[in-house]
Design a protein with these regions (language model features):
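General structural feature for long, well-ordered alpha-helical segments within catalytic domains
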Residues: 1, 18, 22-25, 58, ...
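N-terminal Rossmann-like NAD(P)+-binding subdomain of aldehyde/semialdehyde dehydrogenases
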Residues: 1-51
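Hydrophobic packing residues within well-ordered alpha-helices of enzyme cores
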Residues: 5, 26, 101-104, 132, ...
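A broad detector of the eukaryotic-type serine/threonine protein kinase catalytic domain
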Residues: 6-13, 67, 87, 137
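Short beta->alpha linker loops
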Residues: 7, 17-21, 95-99, 123-124, ...
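Conserved NAD(P)+-binding/catalytic subdomain of aldehyde/semialdehyde dehydrogenases
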Residues: 36, 46, 52, 56, ...
Length: 199
């Protein structure tokens, strides 16, 4: 994969950093897969004869439009934070880096990730933005990039079925890695359940 990143224009040292970061991110998020619900769930105190529980649940189908900067590291960090909470994803990889997209798809295909959970596409963002944002079966969209007019268009089209819209510009992507497990909550919904006691 380092050679592919070099073919796409990165220096060897930067390509090695990308691959090592991606491996670290896979391991990091794999560790959270069976822990994040215990960390973010809670029993709510109520003064009535009820139990009240709040637990994170997956949003559903999340479409992701990846950034051109640090293509592998950014794609893997967002991909892992989305699927670790039980979502499925349709990821539009950076149009200037299609080689690593295909290798990433092959890695996901040969791993234990169930078929259909991760769907990686390559293509032109301008052509696919409308479909990603307006499709009625998509529940959330993550836009990575600096083009504000593209995000506004995605936000407008997402209003048809009230998709959650998340924008991650380059500055936010840099901080994304420092948020730890809280990145998982971006595409999770908190569900509160009330249960009677002593009846």
């Amino acid at each position: 994969m380092v050679q592919e990143l070099c073919l796409e224009g990165l220096q060897k040292k930067q390509a090695e950093f990308e691959v090592n970061s991606a491996i670290d991110l896979f391991i990091y998020y794999a560790g959270w897969a069976d822990k994040y619900q215990q960390v973010f769930s809670k029993v709510n105190p109520v003064a009535q004869p009820y139990f009240s529980f709040t637990v994170p649940e997956p949003t559903g189908v999340v479409s992701v439009l990846c950034s051109d900067n640090y293509p592998l590291k950014n794609a893997v960090s967002i991909l892992c934070s989305v699927i670790v909470s039980g979502n499925t994803t349709i990821l539009l990889y950076s149009e200037s880096n299609p080689l690593t997209a295909m290798s990433l798809a092959e890695i996901v295909h040969t791993s234990d990730v169930p078929a259909g959970v991760v769907n990686i596409l390559t293509g032109f963002r301008k052509e696919l933005l409308t479909q990603f944002a307006s499709h009625m079966d998509v529940n959330a969209i993550i836009y990575c990039g600096e083009k504000l007019e593209e995000f506004k268009e995605a936000q407008k089209l997402s209003a048809l079925n009230l998709k959650r819209c998340i924008i991650l510009n380059d500055e936010k992507l840099d901080r994304f890695y420092q948020e730890g497990p809280y990145t998982i909550l971006r595409t999770a919904e908190m569900k509160t359940t009330w249960h009677p006691v002593g009846l």
